[in-house]
Design a protein with these regions (language model features):
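Active-site beta-loop-alpha junctions enriched in small/polar residues
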Residues: 90, 115-117, 141, 181-183, ...
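Alpha-helical scaffold elements lining the catalytic groove of polysaccharide deacetylases
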Residues: 62, 95, 144-170, 184-231, ...
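Active-site beta->alpha N-cap acidic-glycine motif
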Residues: 49-150, 161-167, 174-175, 269
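A short acidic, amphipathic alpha-helical/loop segment
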Residues: 98-99, 124-128, 189-192, 247-251
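Catalytic grooves of carbohydrate-active enzymes
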Residues: 230-266
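Structural recognition of the beta-strand scaffold that forms the well-ordered cores
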Residues: 83-86, 110-114, 135-138, 176-180, ...
């Protein structure tokens, strides 16, 4: 069976469940509608993955070669056992410090994609990320559906406002790595990000971890995240997940036992 993961809005006001389960050749959505889904290269839409073989990169709805035209990535094309651990941080609910403690214990440098609310409410955590050698990336200022933003001015404003807030908070320029909120994108978005000097970073491994009131169990997390790891994986976790905070030590250990090392996404380019 093929499994597809789609990242949706993870803020406290998160609405309808939109994670999809693939059944046979189609997708069963929360709305109960069976839809056919092509996994060929796509210029617009929601980021989607099809996991077909353990230990191998999934098939995505845009190819590595297509994305590279826009300085964008969902995985590194490599046989080396290295992975790029990333966290999306839309708000702080008490778990980020524990995640940072665990990363420090393993001497792992990760990438945190933050939004404006996170920097405004948790500046000390952002400063700690920087101090401890993590990369802080741009997840936009307000976490909108960027695929619906058609003008370059509006697109630039979402990224530039976060850049300014980050620099005001840390005294440092933000490195230009961008993750589209909810994994929603368009080809024009990719072009605009590239024109701003940004690399767009999708992911090749994730699971449904962003619902505060419906967290996966330890067993579910390990079942999803350990066997599907692959060389060059860009892993997406949410810092709002209590399960992630609790299981991260074990997860890192299991990946290390498989021979994996860890890199920041700025080592992709």
């Amino acid at each position: 069976m093929i499994i597809m993961i789609r990242k949706k809005r993870f803020l406290r006001v998160a609405g309808v469940l939109t994670a999809a389960l693939v059944l046979g050749a189609g997708i069963f959505t929360a709305a109960g509608v069976l839809q056919e889904k092509s996994l060929n290269t796509a210029a617009d839409g929601n980021w989607g993955l099809s996991f077909q073989e353990a230990g191998k990169p999934p098939v995505a709805n845009a190819s590595m070669d297509y994305l590279k035209k826009f300085d964008a990535y969902y995985a590194e094309d490599t046989d080396k056992k290295e992975l790029f651990l990333t966290f999306d941080a839309g708000y702080e609910n008490g778990h980020t410090a524990k995640i940072l403690d665990t990363l420090k214990k393993h001497n792992v440098k990760a990438t945190f994609f933050v939004v404006g609310n996170f920097i405004e409410t948790s500046p000390d955590l952002v400063k700690r990320m920087v101090k401890e050698g993590h990369l802080v990336g741009n997840h936009t200022f307000t976490h909108p559906d960027m695929s619906e933003i058609a003008t370059e001015e509006a697109f630039r404003q979402e990224l530039s406002k976060l850049e300014d807030l980050y620099e005001k908070t840390t005294g440092k320029k933000m490195k230009k790595y961008y993750r589209p909120p909810q994994g929603k994108y368009s080809e024009s978005n990719l072009k605009m990000a590239k024109e701003m000097g940004y690399h767009t970073i999708f992911w090749s491994l994730a699971y449904v971890d962003w619902y505060e009131s419906d967290q996966p169990t330890r067993e579910e997390a390990l079942e999803k995240m350990v066997p599907r790891i692959h060389p060059g994986a860009i892993v997406l976790l949410h810092s709002t997940s209590v399960t992630n905070a609790q299981v991260l030590d074990e997860l890192l250990t299991k990946w290390e036992e498989k021979g994996y090392s860890f890199k920041r996404v700025d080592q992709l380019t």
